Amino acid sequence: MYKNEEIMQFVNLVAEVVAPDRIILFGSYAYGTPNEKSDLDLLVIKNGKDFSVDDEAKLSTAVYLKRKQRNIRTRYDVFIQTDRQVRMSAENGGAFVDAMQKGKVVYERTNQETGFYNI
């Protein structure tokens, strides 16, 4: 299982690569139920034009390469969407309803100090 410091190290890496507006931790780590097989689930919200599958794949590849470069061994699922895409998914009972209702905001661009929150 990952310590809070390891989670925030990975969140920092994602924020550096993607330059998002907000990052939400969801799944077992956000809900306090992680086990040895748990990975980190992050919903990364970056406003602008909607992300295509190719756009998301390019950013996910950049996160993967930066993670390897820094020898960070975190297992993860990162979903990169716009606010509009998340809202549409939530309205249709999609994958991000749970993240929006129960997830923890761990990064937000508008935070004046560092953008990061404690988890």
Give the location of each predicted region.
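Catalytic core of pol beta-like nucleotidyltransferases
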Residues: 1-22, 31-36, 46-119
